[in-house]
Amino acid sequence: MKGIVFTEFLDLVESKFGLETVQQIIDQSELESNGVYTSVGTYKFTEMVSLLTNLSNVTKIAPNDLLKVYGLHFFDALVKNYGSILKTYKGPIELLSSIEGHIHVQVRKLYPDAELPQFETLEQTDDKIVLIYRSSRSLYPFAQGLMEKSFEHYGQNCEIQHELLKDDGSEVRFEILKK
């Protein structure tokens, strides 16, 4: 997992819960990296699971709720670091329909070893998009946060419904309606 995912996660934890909580979850997680991340490094997914689990235990907030908030936060990091890519899209539905065919292609150019989820567009109109999310990491709430924030970025509102196609969350159907 790319380091930017870790650095932004710890930034979010610090901004929402304080530096002491960051240190607490790092200490509790017994990380191979010792909690030292660079945005361009690559780290084990198990470290993120451990950090997330310990944050959930400390805050008493469900992991999926934390992941969704993190997705909302991470979109801002994408705007800051890769805003030029987002400017090529007129709106969130166009952006979301281009994840697999354009955005992930660009990510792979920058980070050839990145392990990205797959997004399949099943249906797309001016006001609706239906996507299938696939990832062995089952981070669909994170993806939902990113989707939600993409609408906000373009000054639009949306309603997102999801259906687990696999119980472990590795395959999820998202239906997103522009409001």
Q: Where are the regions a protein language model picked out?
A:
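A general alpha-helix detector
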Residues: I4-L12, S50-N54
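Short terminal or interdomain "cap/linker" segment that borders an active site or interface and mediates
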Residues: I4, D113-L139, Q156-K179
